[in-house]
Amino acid sequence: MKILFVSRAYPPVIGGIENQNYALSIWLQRYAIVKTLANRYGKKMIPLFFPYVTIRVLFMMRSFDVLFLGDGVLAIVGFIVKLCYPHKTVVSVVHGLDLTYRNNFYQTFWVRCFLPSLDGIIAVSQETKNTAVIKKIPEEKVTVIANGVETEALQGHYERKDLEKLLGVSLEDRYVLLTTGRLAKRKGAVWFIRNVLQKLPNNTLYVLAGAGPEEENIYAAIKETGLAARVIMLGRVSDHDRDLLLNTADIFVQPNIRVPGDMEGFGIAVIEATACQRPVVASNLEGLKDAICHNENGILVTPEDSQAFVTALTRLLHDNHERLALGERAKAYTETHYHWKVIARRYVVALEAAAKSVK
């Protein structure tokens, strides 16, 4: 099978979709012939990239079996291709925000017109599929395939002293909770600081690595609660420092909350943590329910239930054996279920099935 893969978000730009699309472009080549057309220059180039890539795809599509789109925003390209090549297969990955983005123009054309016109949709979680079906995308077109992770690339030989150097504090007799990724409201950091952190043992430190629109609110929550000595905001970090954090923190927390018009499509950050043998405590919400199998690669907690979070975290902090055992199970589970060598093969099977349905 010959796949023409299009990505509007791609390295060297840093981000979750960028990383996933890069991995797809590499790992799919193990099972198929793949040509990638990618925007490598960030959002500023998207207005030029869309007409450019549409024209290129229209000229190239005769030589390929499947047009594979890296996210739902590219559905307009797929729609145009289907008009010109009705017997060619077009499939798109869909993340949560591809369906829930609160813009009437986008909802009218992309969600109600362009996406349903495609031959297949690969949703990154069951919650994303449920949302797609609610949005009237035919259920038979939607396949659920989780995001993948290359476990070996994240794992490293880091020591606690490396973490102390990065954070600039002594960690003797201290526990480190970690959250990484874009600081959006749905991630729940503000809620966690206000409702959970101050109820945890005083020797518990909360580290956030990432940037985003919620930063000011997080700083305000730190000030209001008087927890400045227990919260460290690192901002955006390098891949090296992210890996260091993931390999040395005690517990990874993802305390997501419900936010109208937004959702966690999958939750790749928790899978990156489990790949590094970190126990995870996360909200039993949206795509996190797909990423985490309770008591296998983490613990799922009722969203916005502060006492449930306190109980789960305190138990793990005070029981070294249980914490380490959960981390070991998490790593094994992740390598079995989420390694890219497994996920990429599932993508190829889904693309082959979509191609057969068109013929």
Residue ranges and their predicted role:
Residues 293-295, 299-307, 315-321:
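Conserved acidic donor-binding segment of nucleotide-sugar-dependent glycosyltransferases
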Residues 270, 274-282, 292:
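Short hydrophobic beta-strand element within catalytic cores of glycosyltransferases
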Residues 127, 148:
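Carbohydrate-associated surface elements
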Residues 247-262, 278:
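Acidic donor-binding loop of glycosyltransferase active sites
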Residues 155-170:
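A short helix/loop element that forms part of the nucleotide-sugar donor recognition site in Leloir-type
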Residues 174, 308, 315, 322-336, ...:
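A short, well-ordered alpha-helix in the C-terminal region of glycosyltransferases
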Residues 217-241:
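Nucleotide-activated donor-binding/catalytic signature segment of Leloir-type glycosyltransferases, i.e.
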Residues 4, 170-187, 193-197:
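Conserved donor-binding/catalytic core segment of Leloir-type glycosyltransferases
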